[in-house]
């Protein structure tokens, strides 16, 4: 995605290809360094400068983090890859998943999310619906309402209809 509201600006390289951006062991080593500082925290959140589900080591990372802490592990995601059964399976081990759901049809999806050209709204929505029915953890939906873009009564009614299909 290259969402119109992203605080990081436009996405330079649009992809939906999953990659091993960093070795899992390097991320875990950094976590271990932080844990040695005995800092109090409530949750470990996996998020990045980009979409976490593009990371091919996500499932292993979640599992490795959970072996080191007793706190919940959360993943913040735009939800674009939830149509992929492998991605959904990897997220099942997270305690909390926070997918973005801020479009209600193809036109709003293109306007707000500016997705990869091969993604369409129905595919992404169905992936979220499927995930919501399979996932046993906490599902926290992120809905971004923007003045004069998607906050009018008609848009809100369309959101409500779409949200009724999701188990949360």
Listing of model-derived features with the role each one plays in the protein:
Residues 1-6, 31-34, 102:
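Short, compositionally biased "basic patch" segments
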Residues 1-24:
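Canonical Radical SAM [4Fe-4S] cluster-binding loop centered on the CxxxCxxC motif
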Residues 7, 43-47, 74-76, 98:
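Short, conserved beta-strand segments within well-ordered enzyme catalytic domains
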Residues 7-12, 40-44, 103-108, 138-140:
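Short, basic/glycine-rich phosphate-binding loops at helix/coil junctions
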Residues 18-22, 49-56:
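Short coil/turn segments at secondary-structure boundaries
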Residues 26-49:
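Short Fe-S-cluster ligation motifs
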Residues 53-168:
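Conserved AdoMet/S-adenosylmethionine-binding subsite of the radical SAM
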């Amino acid at each position: 995605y290259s969402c119109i509201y992203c605080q990081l600006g436009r996405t330079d390289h649009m992809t939906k290809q999953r990659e091993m951006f960093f070795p899992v062991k390097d991320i875990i080593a950094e976590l271990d360094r932080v844990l040695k500082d005995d800092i109090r925290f409530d949750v470990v959140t996996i998020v990045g400068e980009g979409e976490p589900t593009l990371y091919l080591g996500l499932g292993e990372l979640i599992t490795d983090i959970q072996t080191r802490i007793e706190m919940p592990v959360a993943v913040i995601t735009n939800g674009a890859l939830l149509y992929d059964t492998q991605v959904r399976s990897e997220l099942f081990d997270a305690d909390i998943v926070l997918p973005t759901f801020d479009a209600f049809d193809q036109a709003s999806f293109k306007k707000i999310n500016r997705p990869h050209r091969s993604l369409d709204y129905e595919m992404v929505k169905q992936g979220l619906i499927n995930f919501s029915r399979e996932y046993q953890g906490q599902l926290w939906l992120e809905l971004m309402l923007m003045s004069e873009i998607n906050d009018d009564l008609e848009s809100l009614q369309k959101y409500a209809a779409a949200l009724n299909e999701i188990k949360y």
